[in-house]
């Protein structure tokens, strides 16, 4: 027996439903203790739209789920066949029909669980912003509070914008954090 995580391809938009169906089959004992866990990995994303923050969930791998198996050396084909029979499951990733599935390595599993927040990471909430160059915005906070200008560049790594504001009748570039900007 070799306990490991595997990636299963599913119909897109059905990941949660398939996770629930497999979890139900686990609880009913259909897989005889071979299927240990199943996850449709999601991450929490902080999104700013129209100046309002909200946290939403986003699928890490749309169209895929993770399944933890303690796959025996003998009889594994029946287990795999039963998993593939679940409505919405397409196949295990990286294998042809009749082949033994290949598990993903521990580093990949760890990175997915860090994104989902199941393993502690520096920050498990990521920011999404919908700014565009040339867009008119208002600065809120800091020395340029309530100044309006046009976005001239966006630095997603540093989470900063360059905004061209009018100071003494001249266009002056000002660097501002994403959180200090609102759309007009």
Curated annotation (Swiss-Prot):
Q: Which UniProt keywords apply?
A: Transcription, Transcription antitermination, Transcription regulation, Transcription termination
Ribonucleoprotein as a keyword?
Answer: no
GO terms for CC?
A: cytosol
Q: Which InterPro entries match?
A: KOW, NGN, NGN-like_dom, NGN_dom_sf, NusG-like, Rib_uL2_dom2, Transcrpt_antiterm_NusG, Transcrpt_antiterm_NusG_bac_CS
Q: Which PROSITE patterns match?
A: NUSG
Please give a single GO biological process term from the UniProt record: regulation of DNA-templated transcription elongation
Question: What family is it from?
Answer: Belongs to the NusG family.
HAMAP family xref list: NusG (MF_00948)
Q: What does this protein do?
A: Participates in transcription elongation, termination and antitermination.
Q: What is the designated name of this protein?
A: Transcription termination/antitermination protein NusG
Species per Swiss-Prot/TrEMBL record? Borreliella burgdorferi (strain ATCC 35210 / DSM 4680 / CIP 102532 / B31) (Borrelia burgdorferi)
């Amino acid at each position: 027996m070799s306990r490991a995580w595997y990636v299963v391809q599913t119909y897109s938009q059905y990941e949660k439903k398939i996770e629930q169906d497999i979890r139900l089959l686990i609880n009913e004992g259909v897989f005889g203790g071979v299927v240990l866990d199943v996850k449709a990995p999601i991450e929490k994303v902080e999104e700013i739209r129209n100046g309002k923050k909200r946290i939403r969930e986003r699928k890490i791998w749309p169209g895929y789920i993770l399944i933890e198996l303690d796959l025996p050396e003998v009889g594994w084909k029946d287990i795999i066949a039963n998993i593939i029979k679940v409505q919405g499951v397409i196949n295990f990733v990286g294998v042809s029909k009749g082949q033994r599935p290949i598990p993903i390595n521990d580093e990949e599993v760890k990175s997915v669980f860090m994104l989902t927040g199941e393993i502690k990471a520096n920050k498990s909430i990521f920011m999404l912003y919908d700014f565009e160059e040339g867009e008119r915005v208002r600065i809120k906070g800091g020395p340029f509070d309530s100044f309006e200008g046009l976005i001239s560049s966006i630095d997603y790594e540093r989470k900063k914008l360059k905004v061209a504001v009018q100071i003494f009748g001249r266009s002056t570039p000002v660097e501002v954090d994403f959180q200090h900007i609102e759309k007009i």
